[in-house]
Amino acid sequence: MSEEKNLLEVSHLKQYFPVRKGFHTIPLKAVDDISFAIKPGETLGLVGESGCGKTTVGRTLLRLYQPTAGRIVFDGDVLFDSGEQYDEEGKIIVDANGNPVKKKSIDVDMLPYRKKMQMVFQDPYSSLNPRMTVEDIIGEPLDVHKLYSSRAE
């Protein structure tokens, strides 16, 4: 029996946001070096206290935020790879000057992938727009991805 490939593979994902402190800008580490894999048919729930980065992970995977570093592979396609090289222990390989050793970075158009990926939030009252009808909420992704030929469909 062959080993089933991963549907989603996340390696060393980092999402930092710049924060101004006086004359300096420092990085706020919202997500710092997270790695996991999901096989077809599996479900992953991110659980943690408020402000720990759960939503940021989801938005970064969907590329609503540009990742700071790491690698995202969905169904065998590399969606993002910042190019850092890692050793067996997960540490970034650096050159003699202390600079990260990189290969070519990869960045792709996400529209074809977003119809296959989604985030589901636990609280439906903050997840669903109360000004939209159920028909509008369900129909919005169908409109975006042009998944019907007529309005009746």
Spans of features found by a protein language model:
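ABC transporter nucleotide-binding domains
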Residues: 1-153
